[in-house]
């Protein structure tokens, strides 16, 4: 009986395939995380992996130009942080106008070129090693790639190439573009001394993405200072950066005849986004009900109705129940005459009028 020391070929192939699939899934997850970090920097809603990697090269190059080195100057860092926030709000406002998608894309692209041109003029130092591709070159390359991939591939003789061959060429082109982007990210890591060249040569793509993601996160939140003076400088620089970017945004809107009518709306959008507060005419919190009070005069829901007067206090009357006189004879059976008399005192009879006494006297035939 011979023991097999090596696994069968089918099992080894399946294991290698599962490991390759796991590695691709991890790379795709890292690219998705990278896209979330640079989403505010982008002007496209849907981005391919090649677009994300190329945009990452642009973002890290610009970040290093704006705030070189691991530590940042509070004035420089605060200015470009405020500048970037207004730039992102401008793109969001353009997308919220509700225009056609092609028109919106054109507005955003022109606005980005306008901001990039003004930013480059504001930068005091420009890194010659990490020159990023301009937006026009990226747009031209992406459009040419899409036109080549979307157009039917034909040979010189006019015979249509097999669809499998076209699909294979597209996949190879996609891999080449991703490879170029990864090479650019590795060169950035070496130039900025994030790692040595020997380490980068043996580095896999997953490690490259981890380093770039950590770099972007550190650059976005790298200003931590306990000094009150530096915090004050940073806050003042943010305000100046926002002010400068607002002026640039208004200049861009005034340069277009379709956007010039939206300048007032843009100003309100900036005001509400930077310092949100309830605007006039919008529903606000209800006024709290005051505690109940007891006024002298009660509340009258219908003032034209007379209010009932409170009963006045009077002295109690002497309770004198009418009764039959003991000296009077029993009542008569005749129903026409009443035998009940109103009791009266002698003083009252003496003071009363004699005519009234005659009228009040009842006729009794038995008297």
UniProtKB/Swiss-Prot annotation:
The UniProt keyword set, sorted, is: DNA-binding, Neurogenesis, Nucleus, Repeat, Transcription, Transcription regulation
UniProt feature, compositional bias: Basic and acidic residues = 161-177
Compositional bias (Low complexity): 141-157, 313-354
**Amino acid composition bias (Basic residues), ranges on this chain:** 356-367
Domain bHLH, which positions? 11-63, 162-219
GO MF annotation, one: protein dimerization activity
Positions of region (Helix-loop-helix motif 2): 176-219
Locate the region Disordered.
1-24, 133-177, 313-367
Renumbered to this chain, the Pro residues biased-composition regions fall at 1-10
Upon deletion of the gene, what happens? RNAi-mediated knockdown causes the formation of misshapen heads as well as ectopic V6 postdeirids.
Question: Quick check: keyword Repeat in the entry?
Answer: yes
Q: What is this protein called?
A: Regulator of fusion ref-1
| Organism per entry | Caenorhabditis elegans
Gene expressing this chain: ref-1
